[in-house]
């Protein structure tokens, strides 16, 4: 039996086991997916512990996505650029780090038939969640990428390695029509379901609204967007997509789209 798992500090409500167990079942993989709650006292020994336990692959969540990078032998190009690893592969005694949030975001937009190349994207929020999204948009040849944050100067210092523009929320109110608006802030996430990062006036200026929040599935931001005729994309498929990509890395397989859809539909019932 192959051993896999999720590494983090507080893991009680993780949906990851459901994603991975479905992939195991559909691909006849004799696998076990565990939750590994790691105290901060042991954060410097994560990779060695995985090797000792015989773990083949692991997902990594907060607060260890950055901390684990120094412990890895090889880090993928996207994880280096993003500055965070959320997937580890142990193979032939070596450890490899990837960022599958990057791929999960791409899978989410591809499924929703949102074209990136040649279009403009405005990203709300300058937290860690924005990094994989900005990198994917950059690599996919978006015409214009704008990071919107409360502190423009602070955001510039934090994201200066990206080929993007910067804007404050006040400046966002004055823009003309653009293509897509992406929320990477926790606004609208349960239990704060009535919060939204931008006004309806701003939302109306876009054709597409994307929210990486998935609890609730339809946030207030997406509800406002839908009511104003925008195409809307919820964040649940990004979660599914990043998990599926991890499985493809660990097991050298290509997961069928039917499996991805089944996982999405099963998880959708939870919200």
UniProtKB/Swiss-Prot annotation:
Q: So where's the catalytic machinery, residue-wise? A: 65
The superkingdom of the source organism is Bacteria
Enumerate the UniProt keywords alphabetically: Amino-acid biosynthesis, Aromatic amino acid biosynthesis, NADP, Oxidoreductase
Answer yes or no on keyword NADP.
Answer: yes
So what does this thing catalyse?
shikimate + NADP(+) = 3-dehydroshikimate + NADPH + H(+)
Which Enzyme Commission number(s) are on file for it? 1.1.1.25
This chain's function reads: Involved in the biosynthesis of the chorismate, which leads to the biosynthesis of aromatic amino acids. Catalyzes the reversible NADPH linked reduction of 3-dehydroshikimate (DHSA) to yield shikimate (SA).
Name of the protein: Shikimate dehydrogenase (NADP(+))
Report the source organism: Clostridium perfringens (strain ATCC 13124 / DSM 756 / JCM 1290 / NCIMB 6125 / NCTC 8237 / Type A)
